[in-house]
Amino acid sequence: MSSPDNSSPSLRIPPWLRVKLPCSHTFADTRALVEGLGLNTVCNSAKCPNMFECFSSGTATFLILGNVCTRNCAFCNITPGHVSPPDPDEPRRVAEAAARLALRHVVVTSVTRDDLDDGGAAHFAATITRLRAALPAATVEVLIPDFRGDHAALRTVMAAAPHIVNHNVETPPAHYARIRPQADYRQSLELLRRVKAAGGVAKSGLMVGLGENDTEVEGVLADLADCGCDIVTIGQYMRPSRQHPPVERYVHPDTFESFAACGRGMGIPFVFSAPLVRSSYNAESAYNALCTLRTEPA
């Protein structure tokens, strides 16, 4: 696959990554609601470039189990360090926020909690249960950590019946030692296989621009197809600060389209691939597209 990408030593942000910030009362109202309930969002904690768009449309991805992580992935803007015990009232407040925002599709993620015996699985399950009670017509998507390969923890989450289980592989395996030193690529693939084996909708994603090449991206897509992944997201890595790894290349939108075509050709039903795509960005649209594909005649 040819890749018409900008990979010069001193990279300038290309025009397709420049985001126009909307001015909206909804943005302020959404942020005030979330903060007023003492909740965190990955949108804010991870400096997501789509935060203004999502908040302005009245959506957010809830970050549970605190905003401090027990791991230190090189690409991530969430602070690593000393964590606090889980807040038992947090699931109720997440459900309240989702109900007050009248969400049709709720996305919940977390920091990685290697300090907890179950990695936070019970807290995820409690949050899913609260959401399904408060918003019975809504779909619930969870973006989970690897739970250190604990199959019982994954079963706890699956028993709460989320509609989508997302776990991101983030980058090709050759780059894990540098980018995700505390994670294991094969362990992540096994988690996704188990989601599918349990009858769930499996979703995963990765970033480009961290030193990988197109062939490696295609290799990840092949692995995710082999796991039975239903939805895959691919987006451009954006350096959160000078303390994070530099962007190695800005991938052209045409190449993102080629990645999507490649993934679909391998049998992945829905591949959402574009520069500003993030794993929870337009998550409702991705899920609806998958449902449409499943109902269309072969």
Curated annotation (Swiss-Prot):
Domain Radical SAM core: 55-269
Principal place of residence: cytoplasm
Entry keyword Methyltransferase: no
GO CC, one annotated term: cytoplasm
Cofactor annotation remark: Binds 2 [4Fe-4S] clusters per subunit. One cluster is coordinated with 3 cysteines and an exchangeable S-adenosyl-L-methionine.
InterPro entries (alphabetical): Aldolase_TIM, Elp3/MiaA/NifB-like_rSAM, Lipoyl_synth, rSAM
CC cofactor: [4Fe-4S] cluster
Binding positions ([4Fe-4S] cluster 1): C43, C48, C54, S280
Annotated keywords: 4Fe-4S, Cytoplasm, Iron, Iron-sulfur, Metal-binding, S-adenosyl-L-methionine, Transferase
Catalytic activity: [[Fe-S] cluster scaffold protein carrying a second [4Fe-4S](2+) cluster] + N(6)-octanoyl-L-lysyl-[protein] + 2 oxidized [2Fe-2S]-[ferredoxin] + 2 S-adenosyl-L-methionine + 4 H(+) = [[Fe-S] cluster scaffold protein] + N(6)-[(R)-dihydrolipoyl]-L-lysyl-[protein] + 4 Fe(3+) + 2 hydrogen sulfide + 2 5'-deoxyadenosine + 2 L-methionine + 2 reduced [2Fe-2S]-[ferredoxin]
Family: Belongs to the radical SAM superfamily. Lipoyl synthase family.
Listed name of the protein: Lipoyl synthase
Organism: Nitratidesulfovibrio vulgaris (strain ATCC 29579 / DSM 644 / CCUG 34227 / NCIMB 8303 / VKM B-1760 / Hildenborough) (Desulfovibrio vulgaris)
Gene behind the chain: lipA
